[in-house]
């Protein structure tokens, strides 16, 4: 399905192609500056860490359900089990293992080479820059900047006075503005916006397919 003319015009208006030069491969990652990192560090009050991870292993726990095709949940294989090191006999034993998984098996960050439109990647480069043997020679994951910055939580359900968003309910610019106003924080270049929809309830209630692909 082709993009509408309205969406094309919007994309051109907010495009960052050429903003940091024609040879740039980091995009808005260029905004992740030392100043942005210091701004994030200055927000720490009590140092509490909030885990956001979901299980990758275990029957019925991985988030992948076979759609899109080729995305598999992680498979754990033990390669050594309580084996003695021949270089240190009688001193210690160890275990080792390996994970076989799709790179999209769980939470991840897409490189700018992940998707294209009209056969063009970020900064007007052809998808011909991607090969099965060479990988992405333009905008590969190695071009991603380290992320150490301030995050702003846009809690959509709480802002709208609901428990979670329903299928088909849009997160509009006005909704995000209301979330940010509620958070009481003025966004600055290099900040990260964390959008909560409440959709994880499907996963927690055992409906992995609804969580993964948005349908029953």
Identify the meaning behind each predicted range.
Residues 1-216:
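Active-/binding-site microenvironments in catalytic and ligand-binding cores
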């Amino acid at each position: 399905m082709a993009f509408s003319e309205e969406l094309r015009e919007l994309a051109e208006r907010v495009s960052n192609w050429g903003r940091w030069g024609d040879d740039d491969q980091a995009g808005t990652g260029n905004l992740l500056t030392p100043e942005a990192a210091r701004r994030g560090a200055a927000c720490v009050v009590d140092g509490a860490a909030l885990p956001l991870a979901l299980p990758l292993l275990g029957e019925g726990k991985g988030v992948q359900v076979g759609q899109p095709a080729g995305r598999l949940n992680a498979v754990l294989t033990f390669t050594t089990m309580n084996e003695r090191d021949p270089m240190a006999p009688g001193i210690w034993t160890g275990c080792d293992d390996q994970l076989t998984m799709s790179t999209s098996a769980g939470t991840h960050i897409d490189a700018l080479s992940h998707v294209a439109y009209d056969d063009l990647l970020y900064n007007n480069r052809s998808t011909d820059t991607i090969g099965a043997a060479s990988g992405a020679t333009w905008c590969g994951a190695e071009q991603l900047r380290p992320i150490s910055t301030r995050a702003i939580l846009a809690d959509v359900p709480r802002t709208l006075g609901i428990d979670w968003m329903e299928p088909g309910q849009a997160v509009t610019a006005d909704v995000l503005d209301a979330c940010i106003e509620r958070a009481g924080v003025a966004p600055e270049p290099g900040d990260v916006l964390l959008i909560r929809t409440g959709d994880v309830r499907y996963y927690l209630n055992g409906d992995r397919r609804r969580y993964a692909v948005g349908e029953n």
